[in-house]
From Swiss-Prot:
One of its GO terms (biological process) is translation. Gene3D superfamilies: 3.30.70.1730, 6.10.250.290. One of its GO terms (cellular component) is large ribosomal subunit. The gene is rplJ. The keyword Ribosomal protein applies. Keywords: Ribonucleoprotein, Ribosomal protein, RNA-binding, rRNA-binding. It comes from Bordetella pertussis (strain Tohama I / ATCC BAA-589 / NCTC 13251). It comes from the Bacteria. Transmembrane segments: none annotated. The keyword Ribosomal protein applies. Belongs to the universal ribosomal protein uL10 family. PANTHER family: 39S RIBOSOMAL PROTEIN L10, MITOCHONDRIAL. Disulfide bonds: none annotated. This is Large ribosomal subunit protein uL10.
Length: 174
């Protein structure tokens, strides 16, 4: 099904809007994937907040022209599926995770703003923790000394109460 000029303009506009919000774009070759597999991949992407779409390469070239993702244009050959996300690691995690279980999906390249990633770069990006994971680790690290201090402060009256209970039990037994 070929698109007419107005439909192409709408697609370019939609993809340009996604690219404007994006922190990462990952492209993968999907040659040989069956519909059921692509449906599972789309569901996973939707749950992770990744915009996943099969597009004509020329339309994507036009959508990324003049943006921080323009270096990716050189990699756009063959049947590709595009993962675009506002989280720098989400698209890489979704596509790399799916590629582990399905060898017909081959990661080709990726891009962060103003930098092109190779296949290995995308896989390395996929192993990084997400922003939420990093924030929770930071918060845990910041709370640990305070929590330990509070437990130490609570231990003094607790020891005193245990001592009183022991004296009471001793007197009750005598």
């Amino acid at each position: 099904m070929s698109l007419n000029r107005q439909e192409k303009a709408v697609v370019i506009e939609e993809v340009s809007a996604q690219v404007a919000k994006a922190q990462s774009i990952v492209i993968a070759e999907y040659r040989g994937l069956d519909v059921a597999s692509v449906t599972v991949l789309r569901k996973t992407a939707r749950e992770s907040g990744v915009y996943l779409r099969v597009l004509k390469n020329t339309l994507v070239r036009r959508a990324v022209a003049g943006t921080a993702f323009e270096p990716l244009s050189e990699q756009l050959t063959g049947p590709l599926i595009y993962g675009i996300s506002a989280d720098p690691v989400a698209a890489a995690k979704v596509l790399a995770g799916f590629a582990k279980s399905n060898d017909k999906l081959v990661i080709k390249a990726g891009s962060l703003p103003n930098s092109l990633l190779t296949q290995d770069g995308v896989k390395a990006l996929a192993t990084m923790p997400s922003r939420e994971e990093l924030l929770s680790k930071l918060l845990g690290t910041m709370q640990a000394p305070i929590a330990q201090f509070v437990r130490t402060l609570n231990e003094v009256p607790t020891k005193f109460a245990r001592g009183l209970a022991a004296v009471r039990d001793q007197k009750a037994a005598a």
